[in-house]
Swiss-Prot record:
Known function: Digests double-stranded RNA. Involved in the processing of primary rRNA transcript to yield the immediate precursors to the large and small rRNAs (23S and 16S). Processes some mRNAs, and tRNAs when they are encoded in the rRNA operon. Processes pre-crRNA and tracrRNA of type II CRISPR loci if present in the organism.
Gene for this chain: rnc
Gene source species: Pseudomonas syringae pv. syringae (strain B728a)
Name of the molecule in the record: Ribonuclease 3
The keyword Ligase belongs to this UniProt entry's keyword annotation: no
Family: Belongs to the ribonuclease III family.
């Protein structure tokens, strides 16, 4: 193992028994050979479970939708990339030449994906308890800053934060119809996001309200919220 990877292990607070797992977790798909996408998939599932379990215990009075919104804040790409930068993770990534030249080692989505891959690698290396311990340790500051007040956000904000947590494009809203007299109009809005095959729709007495209704419908269609809070 190189000295540099030993340094990264100290920053992560974890020493790998199988160092090939660590190297694989740091290997982007632009690099020749095997890459970290499967580990990222596994790490994403573990991260969501550990965060959800911790929130379930920490906020016993919270409703399902509130817990989902808190978790989205914890696991969003911005949060993960910030943690990754704290570990100087970009210095250790294995990137293809094109990705390296374009500054991929600084890109939020690549950093967040690599951190999730490391979570998956730790799980395979030492099991669930080791992965849980590292996730909770890394997210201590974020956990401590959460309150249920954080869930009192409008649907558009909640949808945006959820999509950012998945490194997805932001939603696009379009007014498709306006009905009624000038003093009593009804606006019809469609919300388009890449994760859904169909557009979500909303209507209201203003464009702003119609957009909020469409965003709420999108959250339900995504399974993030159940619409029964």
């Amino acid at each position: 193992m190189s000295v540099s990877l030993s340094r990264l292990e100290r920053q992560l607070g974890y020493t790998f028994k199988d160092q090939e797992l660590m190297v694989l977790a740091l290997t982007h798909r632009s690099f020749a050979g095997r890459n970290n996408e499967r580990l990222e998939f596994l790490g994403d599932a573990i991260l969501n479970f550990v965060a959800g379990e911790a929130l379930f215990e920490r906020f016993p009075q919270a409703r399902e939708g509130q817990l989902s919104r808190l978790r989205a804040r914890l696991v969003k790409g911005e949060t993960l990339a910030l943690l990754a930068r704290g570990f100087d993770l970009g210095e250790y990534l294995r990137l293809g030449s094109g990705e390296l030249k374009s500054g991929g080692f600084r890109r939020e989505s690549i950093l967040a994906d690599a951190l999730e891959a490391l979570i998956g690698a730790i799980y395979l290396d030492a099991g669930m308890e080791a992965a849980r311990e590292r996730v909770l340790a890394w997210l201590t500051t974020e956990f401590d800053s959460l309150t249920l007040v954080d869930t009192n956000k409008d649907p558009k904000t909640r949808l945006q934060e959820f999509l950012q947590s998945r490194a997805c494009e932001l939603p696009r809203y379009e007014v498709v119809d306006i009905q009624g007299e000038p003093h009593c109009r009804t606006f019809f809005v469609e919300c388009e996001i890449n994760l859904l095959n169909e557009k979500s729709r909303g209507q209201g007495v203003s464009r702003r309200i119609a957009e909020q209704v469409a965003a709420a419908a999108a959250l339900i269609a995504l399974g993030v919220e159940n619409g029964h809070e």
